[in-house]
């Protein structure tokens, strides 16, 4: 299913490096070894209340570029969008309930003509662990997303300092140099950008730390259990 592939590609792009957040020392981060930077980042993420994760995953051409913009609120849920060349969907998770609203083309891919007709202009509602919703919801659950960010990196090496959007950052590379995470060197050690140079190249930006995230159950939702195939 194309929708399921969206999720797999986005999550795969996040694997090579670690996500950091608030709570770090404002001085000396750039002088630490890469393992210490990652360890401090791992501890810090436990305290961030909210974060925005946005970016692109490139499957080889701009036609196949996947764009996503997610806002995660720890302990409450999340909201966001994912799009690829005419197929797009919005997501909201609130507690144990997930909502998805797709474009007509997306619903055609997801469930066929009958399902697309029933969901025109509506949200589909389901338990967050139900079927494909478990894949959708994984993108908007902070804990799950962070787990993907933290797993599977190889030996780490420290890069140079630079500036991104006016903030000084230190680079941390994975063993294959396929992934580079840029972490702020002053103030809390927030992640600023993750770049993955693998075949599914990605650029992922982090921001909005501890910013308010407005979550509301969408109106005009249809239960997944009431759909007629």
List the model feature ranges, each with a label.
Residues 63, 82-85, 153-155, 165-167, ...:
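Short solvent-exposed loop/turn micro-motifs enriched in small/polar/acidic residues
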Residues 38-106, 180, 196:
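N-terminal mature ectodomain segment of secretory-pathway/periplasmic proteins
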Residues 160-222:
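Gly/Pro-enriched, hydrophobic low-complexity segments
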Residues 114-133, 209-229:
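A short, charged
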Residues 2-5, 9-74, 162, 211-213, ...:
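N-terminal leader/targeting segments and the immediate start of mature chains
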Residues 68-78, 134-158, 164:
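Short, basic/low-complexity N-terminal boundary segments at the transition from targeting/disordered tails
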Residues 101-145:
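Acidic/charged, solvent-exposed loop-and-adjacent secondary-structure segments enriched in E/D, K/R, S/T
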Residues 89-93, 110-113, 202-205, 226-229:
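A short, polar/proline- and glycine-enriched secondary-structure boundary/capping micro-motif
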